[in-house]
A protein has these predicted regions:
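All-alpha prenyltransferase/terpene-synthase fold signal
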Residues: 1-172
Length: 172
């Protein structure tokens, strides 16, 4: 809904550059979601896939917002590209920080611990630990998490393992 509304609003500006930006965002978001969904049964734990997904989703949102802001005040294409790059980098940093928050309970954030894992998502801290330590029992548990078959207790055990093995420090 929000993307469709954004596209409508971009069209109302009569600025084809904004329409192209929002249309491209829709394509990127769709590609990111497809990559993420196709990775749910993967037996590997690729950081490259993780970064591809966040670049096409969160970072694309930030990048488009920054570029649209620049273009809406009639900046040059060069300035708009720089704004888009800054937005992309902020989006990547934002997503990694959000993923780190998933390892710590906080009423302030309104995000329960392990929420990403309860949705079958393994993020940068977990990927680092899985690839670095190659612990077969944790790999099996990670596959269970991806398949949405892990209990809350198993997710809590996995979170502790990631924290104890430097996953949060790596992602920071």
């Amino acid at each position: 809904y929000l993307l469709a509304t954004s596209l409508t609003n971009a069209a109302l500006t009569m600025d084809i550059r904004l329409v192209e930006l929002v249309s491209h965002l829709g394509q990127q978001l769709s590609e990111g979601e497809i990559i993420q969904l196709s990775n749910t049964n993967a037996s590997d734990f690729s950081e490259a896939v993780y970064f591809d997904v966040i670049k096409k989703k969160t970072a694309a949102l930030f990048s488009t917002a920054a570029a649209a802001g620049a273009k809406s005040v009639h900046s040059t294409d060069e300035i708009a590209k720089k704004a888009a790059l800054i937005g992309e980098l902020i989006g990547i940093a934002f997503q990694i920080k959000d993923d780190i928050f998933d390892y710590n309970a906080s009423d302030e954030l309104g995000k329960p611990t392990g929420n990403d894992m309860k949705e079958g998502k393994l993020t940068l801290p977990a990927l680092y630990v899985l690839n670095t330590y190659q612990d077969s029992s944790m790999i099996d548990l990670a596959l269970k998490i991806r398949a949405l078959e892990a209990s809350d207790e198993e997710i809590a055990r996995f979170i502790d393992y990631v924290k104890q093995h430097g996953g949060l420090e790596y992602a920071s």
